[in-house]
Amino acid sequence: AEILRSVQESMAAWRQRRSSHRTKRAESSICYNGIGCFQTSGPYGYIDILPSPPEEIATRFLLYSSRRSRGDTPLMDVPFTNLSAVFDWAGQAYNVSAPTKIIVHGFGSSCSYVWAYEMRSALMSVEDCNVICVDWEGGATLPNYVRAAANARLVGKQLAMLIQGLQKLGLSLQNIHMIGFSLGAHVAGFAGAELKNLSRITGLDPAGPLFESQDPRARLDSSDAHFVDVIHSNGENLILGGLGSSQPMGHVDFYPNGGRMQKGCSHLFVGAVTDIFLSVSEVEGRSLCNHRRAYKFFTDSVSPQCQFPAVRCDSFDKYAAGACFPCPDGELCSNMGYYADKVKGRGVQYLVTRDEEPFCAHQYLVRVDSTPSVLPVVSYGKIQLTLISNDDLNETFVLTMKDDEELKVGASLSKIIVPHPALQSFTALE
């Protein structure tokens, strides 16, 4: 799937269309039976496209239960056009007292993708819950990203209607946690704005193009639920391959590895320069690696053994330099991912992850101080640190930026390291 190329070309065509209209276009609206009316005015006027007809979007709700589902087969796979069937079934078999997790995919995706299965399985493995996957593949199909962005509003309204129906059967909004990836994060936001008192929304690298810096009513925002947590993994400029947003949108916003590019994924700027030498699949894979890390981080975090501790700081550069270590109290620290609502830390939070799975681990600030000298001695080389556990496991970290780093006498060197989880109880250093 050529997702990045589709987004870039669709956005270019949208900008060209807007620039060709020197005068304001007439506002338009459309009403869909049983759903409501949509306009190209107000906070949504900038997109200038109305949502597609519901029959084209073909939204489906796939319902699972940790008690009743078997394998990958949903208990129900219901199109929005037959929503009453959900309520008939739910009245008999839906556990309204159990937490309900709702997964919403983004552009060029569907509920049949592996990541949705892995997230669903992880959620049902840690608690007795219901899981609903919102499949709007027909409205999120390539190549028209702008059309998909417009459709997100309608899908959000459809999702809100599903929840309102389940409320009548006893489901509490305080038991609902929506998890949206990319465009799906904004779908969740639109649904939350409609419902008013939703408990929680987790935005996984919310889509940036057409949403960043827009009116809070036209994107995911902290007002859409009592608790909104966001993981930013690809908040780079679209020209450089960025598909996510860097704008804070929640009560707590996590920026792993700075939030622009992720460890283990190729550098976006270098990639942009070399795009002309690479195949579409190579360019696509490099960019999407950063974007998709958001849902990988979240899925990993569902396991209680996989923690992503984060610290509030003014910038990632300050964080990486150790300026915000240690966390003086629990008010400034948080835990990225599934358990973010269990800790007090809010605001902009930074952390460093591993570059391969497991991505989660504790972070340690290492500082090397050299003894001062009356003589201005300078040497060149690299400094390595090896951690050794009591069962002889070890891992080595290079603390200098390069092999011939300038090492001045009396200077200090600081770096944050993230050891493998098996080395969390190391007993020796070399």
Enumerate the predicted regions with their spans.
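Flexible, membrane-associating and regulatory peripheral segments of lipid-active enzymes
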Residues: A1-C133, A140-P143, R147, N151, ...
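Glycine-rich nucleophile elbow surrounding the catalytic serine of serine-hydrolase chemistry
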Residues: H105, I179-F190
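Mature extracellular/periplasmic domains of secretome proteins
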Residues: R120, A191-L195, P216-D224
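Non-catalytic cap/lid and distal C-terminal segments of serine-dependent acyl enzymes
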Residues: N151-A152, N197
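Active-site loop->helix "elbow" adjoining a glycine-rich segment at hydrolase catalytic centers
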Residues: V155, S182-L183, P206
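Alpha/beta-hydrolase fold nucleophile elbow
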Residues: G170-S182, I201
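The feature captures the conserved acid-bearing segment of alpha/beta-hydrolase catalytic domains
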Residues: D205-Q262
